[in-house]
């Protein structure tokens, strides 16, 4: 009887070592590739906006298609802080600033409604991307770590920067 119990436990452990851990490793590598792809796409998208000072519907659509190409679903949030400068004319030849420069914020829905959008030098662009589905690696981690209470990580990318060039579009 004791030998049967040990044999069953050994078979169970062998199955875990031979099938579950390699599956978890491959799923984690898939998530790593998705993370790298999403981070690169987010960086490229943000840098294009920063260096051109312009955001078009085609640029946004291409970004969303790149995100979707990983096989996951994502929530992409765009935040643009537009610089509202406050120059005042003191006399005909003298320009001074009265008060402070203020940024006003546009969020994703406002940005998408105003496409194409031209930005000015000094505006701030932020793009945050987070997956909305649970990946295979996340499901396996949740199953394996259910006892310990660990949660699975998300695929997240963040990028921001200041617009350095203004286009005349």
Question: Where would I find each of the regions flagged by the language model?
Answer:
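Low-complexity, flexible helical/coil segments
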Residues: 1-5, 79, 161-169
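Alpha-helical assembly-interface signal, strongest on the long, hydrophobic N-terminal helix that forms
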Residues: 2-65
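A sequence-composition feature that detects small, non-aromatic residues
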Residues: 5, 10, 14-15, 27, ...
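Generic intrinsically disordered, low-complexity segments enriched for polar/acidic and small residues
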Residues: 42, 100-104, 142
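Residue-level signal for the start and early helices of compact helical domains
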Residues: 21, 67-69, 154
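Short amphipathic secondary-structure patches
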Residues: 48-117
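Glycine-rich, aromatic-bearing surface loops/beta-hairpins
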Residues: 126-169
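Envelope-exposed proteins and targeting segments
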Residues: 121-125
């Amino acid at each position: 009887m004791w030998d049967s119990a040990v044999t069953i436990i050994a078979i169970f452990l062998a199955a875990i070592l031979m099938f579950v851990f390699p599956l978890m490793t491959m799923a984690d590598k898939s998530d790593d590739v998705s993370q790298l792809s999403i981070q690169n796409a987010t960086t490229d998208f943000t840098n294009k906006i920063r260096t051109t000072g312009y955001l078009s519907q085609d640029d946004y659509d291409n970004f969303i298609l790149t995100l979707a190409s990983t096989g996951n679903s994502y929530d992409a949030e765009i935040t643009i802080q537009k610089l509202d400068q406050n120059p005042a004319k003191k006399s005909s030849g003298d320009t001074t600033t009265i008060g402070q420069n203020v940024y006003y914020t546009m969020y994703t829905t406002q940005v998408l409604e105003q496409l194409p959008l031209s930005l000015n030098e000094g505006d701030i662009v932020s793009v945050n991307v987070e997956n909305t589905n649970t990946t295979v690696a996340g499901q396996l981690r949740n199953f394996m770590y259910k006892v310990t209470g660990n949660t699975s990580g998300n695929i997240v990318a963040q990028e921001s920067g200041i617009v350095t060039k203004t286009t005349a579009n």
